[in-house]
């Protein structure tokens, strides 16, 4: 099967042998020679010389026809080309098929056609003569009489090949390919109306029906067609033809693309970007007869003679709202959304300020303020009083009806008409950290309190192990802090508070039980999941409430040589750290059992000044918060019944999670922690994540 049979074009056999025969070469040379005149024969021979620089050069075609491509001869932009006409092959003259690039291998053949600029004259001539255009740019009906005499024209099915229907030449029609000589402004581009649809007046003198009622949108099958039979049949014509550049008003000739595939891809990206604010053209766009991107008509009366009005402004990328952005409408101007949004879709007042605080590309801002700049009673705005644009008055709120019975809404609430948004959380301002921190943190007092607590709770053997671990990093602490003055220590505390400010959002967003403590082991931040798991309240951990915990993970009977934690008087917020006047937070050693505390400080000694990005993953036992009353309940028989029920039914919700380790007061967990350092390379805080082992 040869190439002619594949393309479906009837070509006489033997015309394209693939070799440059003498007839083709002679014909090619004769086409390059000027028409002979009555001048001297020497001048004719001089003009026939191919190496003569004065010989006129023919402009190379953008794409050769199939016959010229096979013969490797120069072709022209017209179809049929002169060579095919001379050889009587004008009916079979069509564009040749180029070899696809690798990145276009999956692209359809129709999308790789040359850009519109190469066939602009052909489109103009065809539309003026009301001749349909086939997909490859050739006329489906040959208007040349001599061509039809040589070869009979084959009938063409208009349903299959008429991809660009020609608008009817009536008063209300619009030719998208009008030339500037017809009274059109040279800066006016295509109308938003796609030439795929016929803009013609009906026979009874009424305007073409774009919508059945004011509040009812027509389906895409009835869009912009005055023909009753076509409007009733949703499949009468192709609504979306990817090869039609006017469907989305893409000016392919100005994009400098060699094929439609890349130009349409680039244009579609721009179309998607400009459609970020929704399909809501204004009244001026309705007077021009624009249609929405969804294909549904939004206005009932198109204006006749598009592009001929002296007040008509050019459309940027076929979007009238882009022009109104550059035109700068007055402040407080409302956008009439036409039939796209029903009159009863007005948002409540609290929704206006909670709308997205950003400009879409096509929503023309009246000023540089946010569309939702109206103050909300739920959001304190005291922290933003110094803004440079706060003196600009917000757009007036209007609930009045426009003359056509449709409600006006502002551009900030067009995107989500039925969205329910709760009151916003106030944005925290980190500037208060730098203003509130005036004194350095007393780490020396914190280490002294930690040492006293360890001596009271642990046995001498375990106390020695913890002391050795802390003593191994003591020289490093002295070396890094001996050159720091008071201002450096204040700056260190500001860095800690600023980092903790960031971790608070992380803790609230993460569902894992998390705590953050200082290098002394004092708790600085805690998540609610940790409180659910262990029973320790946040205020108790931060030292804001009295600590009544009596659970130390061991026996209440005092051991020999040391004092048990059970005999230690619980301390509260009234017991303040000496010299600082601040409440004492809970230490990390109070949350772990004895073995876990010893193991933690031995790992901390290796990681504090070691690997700055290292972490430790191991298992531990968390101590639940228990008062004396809780300890008595834990020893009762009712708790044994609860543990049996827990083993049978499993853990469900917060109640089941809170009951983990209720009997013995310990929760077996796997935890991961890391050390974060400050700008002086000193351990600043410890971040720990826990997961219970079920």
Swiss-Prot record:
Q: Which GO terms describe its cellular component?
A: nucleus
> Bias regions of kind Low complexity — which residues?
142-171
Q: Which GO terms describe its biological process?
A: cellular response to starvation; gluconeogenesis
The parts of the chain that form a coiled coil are none
Q: Where is this region: Disordered?
A: 1-61, 126-240, 276-300, 552-582
Write down the SUPFAM superfamilies for this protein, in alphabetical order: Zn2/Cys6 DNA-binding domain
Give the UniProt subcellular location, in the record's own words: Nucleus
Q: What is this protein called?
A: Transcription activator of gluconeogenesis Pc22g08580
The organism's lineage?
Eukaryota, Fungi, Dikarya, Ascomycota, Pezizomycotina
